[in-house]
Amino acid sequence: MDFKNAVKALQIGKKEGKKFRLSTEFGKNPEEELPFPEYPRPQMRRENWTNLNGWWEYAFTETQKMPKQRDGKILVPFSPECDASGVKRQLLPKEYLWYFRTIQVPKIPAGKRLLLQFGAVDQDAVLYCNGKRAGGHLGGYLSFSVDLTLYLKTGENELAVKVRDETDTDWKGRGKQSLTPGGMFYTAQSGIWQSVWMEWVPETYLERIVITPEYDTASVKVRVFLNGPDTGLTKKITVRESEAPDAKVICIRETRENEAELILGNFAGWSPEHPHLYGVSIEAGEDRVESYFGMRKFGIGKDEKGITRLFLNGKPYFQN
């Protein structure tokens, strides 16, 4: 773009253009179809879980008091501002957006806990179970979980999520989302915008795992983090040739420590051209999760001409 065209592209002194909504086939979701039916957290999968995506009730309020009336239905996990949600309304900084739905708990198993998982809620979320505050989270981009166990009752349980999003009017909001979109700034999005699900776990469960491939030593390190103090629980780690459940087992390690290194021997390296992934199962007591990893290493080095390059698996790798 030359200087004249650059000046013409400026918004200064221009009248506001006519606004219209962009829509695609992806914004159309049949009412009977469950959005995103797959397990939402591919690197830490549990077998028994319940998808809570779908139609929730919602209400906009000007106060923090939980409303008795509902404004309608919203399709989770689509933000209220987008067409797919069925709402098409902006959440303003001084408003609150409430989500409501019920879950059925026929029986509360002994020695189990029920975790409610959120992929992301923008921006400040507070969760209530049967009218009692169960937890919350500040930040619109990270996942979080809430333990519902203490607030449950047998039968029907009501969940309520209160959301506030101050967007670009507060120090917490940075980026291109704006209440006055134009140019490179786009309409702010708010509320639940990633999948919601629940899963039963034992009293002591895997809260987080970290898998680190060690390319040079043909091994992989696995760290586990439990939800509470570790009392010497045995952890079992199994690495398979692929993510298929019946794939050949390469190595198994049992330990009471929270970190273990497993030797793979000859391995298939990961690259964009050959994206081979190994499957891994991690067990800690009664809890079990499935995950995966690729054997690769990144770095910066000099090529044969002495030019600094990005290296993948010990070789210069071009990317643009």
Describe every region a protein language model picked out.
Residues 129, 219-253, 260:
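Beta-strand-rich binding/interaction modules
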Residues 146-150, 261-275:
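Signal that preferentially marks extracellular ectodomain short beta-strand elements
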Residues 8-12, 22, 26-30, 38, ...:
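Accessory beta-strand-rich segments of carbohydrate-active enzymes
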Residues 158-161, 274-285:
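Short, aromatic- and glycine-rich surface loops/edge beta-strands on solvent-exposed regions
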Residues 56, 131, 196, 278, ...:
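Conserved, mostly hydrophobic/aromatic
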Residues 200-230, 306-309:
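Surface beta-strand/loop "capping" patches
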Residues 209-210, 279-320:
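N-terminal carbohydrate-binding accessory modules
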Residues 128-134, 240-242, 285, 313-314:
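Short strand-turn-strand beta-turns centered on an Asx-Gly dipeptide
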